């Protein structure tokens, strides 16, 4: 299995002959190394409906009839664009042929802005727990710090956590470090920073605040060093 980070909130997981993309915001993302023309995922996981997370989902999914797994309202809207979807909701889990997915709480918003500047409500934002090949991966999506992160870590011991540190729209470095203390992952990767001026951060500040977890600061395209 290979797990790699690709700028902003994009994570790629290659497992059991399948490619999974989380929040594939590629076009317009100056931090990513990916190109839409070169990607053809089998599975796409979405945390919420903001444009910088839905990104290029529809175009990517149509390449090889990929399954898009997303919060209910977002999944329904994407299905209306001619894409195969599986809707889920916070607290729900589902076994798939590639592994198990469980949606968790996140404190954020979720809406999509169309080309005509219409704002479409996309339901509740979520974090994602992914259980593959004996590993538990937590992608927090966009979120503030919340105390039930302790419960997430207690219920599902986490091997790798991807946490936003950009501040302004999500947790900043200090709150993200507190989130690490709640979740207690073996490895944590900072995400959702330096894409736009309001979320410019030095990830080393976050790393210096973290205790008892290994911080891996990854450039776009770099792989997580898994044990």
Swiss-Prot record:
Signal peptide: none
Protein keywords: Hydrolase
Source domain of life: Bacteria
InterPro entries registered for this protein in UniProt: Metallo-B-lactamas, RibonucZ/Hydroxyglut_hydro, UPF0173, UPF0173_UPF0282_UlaG_hydrolase
UniProt entry tagged with the keyword Zinc-finger: no
MF terms in GO: hydrolase activity
UniProt cross-references to SUPFAM superfamilies, sorted A to Z: Metallo-hydrolase/oxidoreductase (SSF56281)
Listed NCBIfam families: PRK00685.1 (NF001911)
Family: Belongs to the UPF0173 family.
Protein name as it appears in the record: UPF0173 metal-dependent hydrolase Bsph_4138
Taxonomic source organism: Lysinibacillus sphaericus (strain C3-41)
């Amino acid at each position: 299995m290979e797990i790699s980070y690709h700028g902003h909130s994009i994570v790629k997981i290659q497992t059991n002959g399948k490619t999974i993309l989380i929040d594939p915001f590629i076009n317009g993302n100056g931090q990513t190394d990916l190109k839409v023309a070169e990607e053809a995922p089998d599975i796409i996981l979405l945390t919420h409906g903001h444009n910088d997370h839905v990104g290029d989902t529809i175009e990517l999914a149509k390449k090889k009839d990929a399954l898009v797994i997303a919060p209910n309202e977002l999944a329904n809207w994407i299905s209306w664009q001619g894409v195969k979807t599986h809707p889920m909701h916070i607290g729900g889990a589902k076994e798939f042929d590639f592994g198990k997915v469980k949606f968790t709480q996140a404190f954020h918003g979720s809406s999509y802005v169309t080309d005509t500047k219409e704002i479409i409500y996309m339901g509740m934002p979520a974090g994602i727990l992914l259980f593959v090949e004996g590993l538990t991966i937590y992608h927090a999506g966009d979120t503030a710090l919340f105390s039930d992160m302790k419960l997430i870590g207690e219920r599902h011991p986490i091997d790798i956590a991807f946490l936003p540190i950009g501040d302004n729209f999500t947790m900043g470095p200090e709150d993200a470090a507190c989130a690490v203390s709640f979740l207690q992952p073996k490895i944590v990767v900072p995400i959702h920073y330096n894409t736009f001026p309001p979320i410019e951060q030095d990830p080393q500040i976050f790393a210096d605040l973290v205790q008892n977890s290994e911080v891996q600061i990854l450039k776009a395209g770099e792989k997580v060093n898994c044990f």
